[in-house]
């Protein structure tokens, strides 16, 4: 163990400002707030998985990717739940003992090895979903013939990106020092910021690509609706638009959540370096910025409500088509006239 690690391990007592932050009313409110977010995410994750399983709004490839991402989010949210409960317990039991408030980083191995990989996996889900949309549009025939192979391949790549990021950040890093919560990274993780920048770049690139694919899908669907009488071709175009729109919304929301967390933390660090912001204020604000936790709530919300909306719209369209025109020939003639 080097000198820096030894120094960090010697600082086992929380400062007065940090102690005040950890036992404050604000932190207790934050505990209730984060627990509520996690519990709501559990409910909507279950509803979203049911929606994906029972309805064919999304393609089989997209559904498989989304289900795996939802299951991963459950693990991440559960890790967040456990770390907040243990922190709240210590803040109550050891509120007058600053030297027992903090967690030794080496005692948080279980949490670290779940929280960060699942967080990276959630972030890199945008990579899989974006390429899923690209392949579905530009290699449509191949995509529909090999959906499960494509989904599995993209998930493997997503996992490799996750493992690579985790390896860069944590490999060979001494888990020295003490942290306020077990999901806080050890101080000696020097590449943490660099990997965050890579994640941000990946998400921005995926947003741009997904928006482009959505735009192209909308144009393509309008053209097909005018020129094609094939129900299969028309439905495939409609499915591409619906799925691309949902994925685009999901990626933008996930990016927004993570950027609020990243930008907020960096801004606080910048302000702290320029002015005398106390640890109490710093940790009180940072505790409200777990971006991936919020992103893991947004994903099932988008899936569930988008599925309900699309199902309702589909039923309305079918009802209009079947109620207004009793004769199939008359309906086809009308479609021909409207497409001229």
Curated annotation (Swiss-Prot):
<protein>
    <recommendedName>
        <fullName>Serpentine receptor class alpha-18</fullName>
    </recommendedName>
</protein>
<feature type="transmembrane region" description="Helical">
    <location>
        <begin position="29"/>
        <end position="49"/>
    </location>
</feature>
<feature type="transmembrane region" description="Helical">
    <location>
        <begin position="198"/>
        <end position="218"/>
    </location>
</feature>
<dbReference type="Pfam" id="PF02117">
    <property type="entry name" value="7TM_GPCR_Sra"/>
</dbReference>
<keyword id="KW-0472">Membrane</keyword>
<feature type="transmembrane region" description="Helical">
    <location>
        <begin position="285"/>
        <end position="305"/>
    </location>
</feature>
<dbReference type="GO" id="GO:0007606">
    <property type="term" value="P:sensory perception of chemical stimulus"/>
</dbReference>
<dbReference type="GO" id="GO:0016020">
    <property type="term" value="C:membrane"/>
</dbReference>
<feature type="transmembrane region" description="Helical">
    <location>
        <begin position="149"/>
        <end position="169"/>
    </location>
</feature>
<dbReference type="GO" id="GO:0004930">
    <property type="term" value="F:G protein-coupled receptor activity"/>
</dbReference>
<comment type="similarity">
    <text>Belongs to the nematode receptor-like protein sra family.</text>
</comment>
<keyword id="KW-1133">Transmembrane helix</keyword>
<feature type="transmembrane region" description="Helical">
    <location>
        <begin position="249"/>
        <end position="269"/>
    </location>
</feature>
<feature type="transmembrane region" description="Helical">
    <location>
        <begin position="109"/>
        <end position="129"/>
    </location>
</feature>
<dbReference type="InterPro" id="IPR000344">
    <property type="entry name" value="7TM_GPCR_serpentine_rcpt_Sra"/>
</dbReference>
<keyword id="KW-0812">Transmembrane</keyword>
């Amino acid at each position: 163990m080097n000198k820096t690690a030894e120094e960090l391990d010697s600082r086992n007592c929380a400062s007065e400002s940090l102690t005040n932050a950890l036992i404050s009313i604000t932190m207790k409110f934050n505990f209730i707030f984060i627990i509520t977010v996690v519990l709501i995410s559990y409910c909507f994750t279950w509803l979203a998985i049911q929606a994906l399983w029972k309805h064919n709004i999304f393609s089989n490839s997209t559904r498989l990717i989304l289900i795996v991402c939802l299951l991963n989010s459950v693990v991440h949210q559960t890790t967040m739940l456990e770390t907040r409960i243990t922190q709240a317990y210590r803040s109550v039991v050891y509120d007058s003992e600053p030297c027992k408030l903090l967690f030794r980083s080496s005692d948080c191995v279980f949490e670290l090895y779940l929280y960060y990989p699942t967080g990276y996996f959630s972030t890199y889900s945008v990579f899989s979903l974006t390429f899923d949309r690209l392949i579905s549009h530009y290699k449509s025939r191949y995509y529909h013939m090999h959906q499960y192979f494509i989904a599995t391949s993209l998930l493997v790549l997503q996992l490799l990106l996750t493992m690579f990021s985790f390896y860069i950040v944590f490999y060979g890093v001494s888990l020295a020092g003490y942290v306020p919560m077990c999901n806080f990274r050890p101080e000696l993780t020097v590449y943490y910021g660099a990997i965050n920048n890579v994640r941000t770049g990946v998400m921005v690139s995926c947003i741009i690509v997904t928006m482009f694919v959505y735009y192209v899908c909308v144009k393509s669907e309008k053209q097909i609706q005018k020129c094609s009488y094939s129900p299969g071709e028309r439905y495939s175009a409609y499915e591409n638009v619906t799925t691309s729109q949902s994925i685009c919304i999901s990626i933008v929301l996930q990016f927004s959540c993570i950027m609020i967390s990243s930008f907020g933390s960096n801004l606080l660090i910048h302000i702290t370096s320029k002015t005398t912001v106390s640890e109490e204020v710093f940790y009180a604000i940072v505790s409200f910025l777990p971006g991936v936790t919020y992103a893991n709530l947004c994903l099932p919300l988008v899936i569930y409500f988008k599925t309900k909306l699309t199902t309702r719209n589909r039923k309305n369209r079918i009802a209009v088509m079947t109620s207004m025109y009793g004769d199939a020939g008359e309906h086809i003639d009308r479609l021909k006239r409207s497409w001229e």
